[in-house]
Amino acid sequence: MSEFIRNEEVLRLAALGKTYNPGTPLEQQVLHDIDLRLGRGELTALIGPSGSGKSTLLNLIGLLDSPSAGELYLLGRPTHALDDAARTRLRNEAIGFVFQFHHLIPAFSVLDNVLMPLMIRHGKPTPAEVELALELLQAVDLRGFADKKANQISGGQQQRVAIARALVTRPALLLADEPTGNLDTKTAESVFALFRRFNREFGCAVLVVTHDPRLAASCARTVQLVDGRIVSDQANA
């Protein structure tokens, strides 16, 4: 595991805005002047009511969409002027994703699902990459399930596989959109415990969208979004 400098800047948003259908009768501004910084080793919850812009913001941060205003810096690099190929390359190299629905491939083994981002990147994984994937499965208590098909394990186990998959590329930034939305309370707490562990041990910045105030409070920091604006950004006790 490589050393990292805690709080070294991973992400910076400067006056970020997003408007859909600009210049038309359907124009709608959903994000307004968002300023945010995330550092290595920082675990941050993003909360807010439905329709507040959380998913839109996560899509912008994940380089899945482009802002209408402002700038997004990832690892110190401005992203606004990047072409599609460069954005895709930076996203694949620097960002891991965990969603409410795990999107595992049912007919593939648990191990192959974890390795999938590496297979997409450069084909057959190296022995070192396979070993890392197995280490991640060990960390999420699923090493013994490596050869099972993804559709042969429980929903909570599938979400843990998704976390291992998101980390196999050693991303600088991990984005999680309602990752516990379909899980019971005990399983949800175990998933958040994994985020805290990997945030601490891997040194990645983690941003988690959640509707659960208890889980948000377990993060080091909570950012609240209302009507497309950050109304609160505070450390948790």
Q: What would you call each of these model-derived segments?
A:
Residues 8-11, 16-218, 222-225:
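ABC family nucleotide-binding domain
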Residues 1-19, 232-237:
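ABC-family P-loop ATPase nucleotide-binding domain
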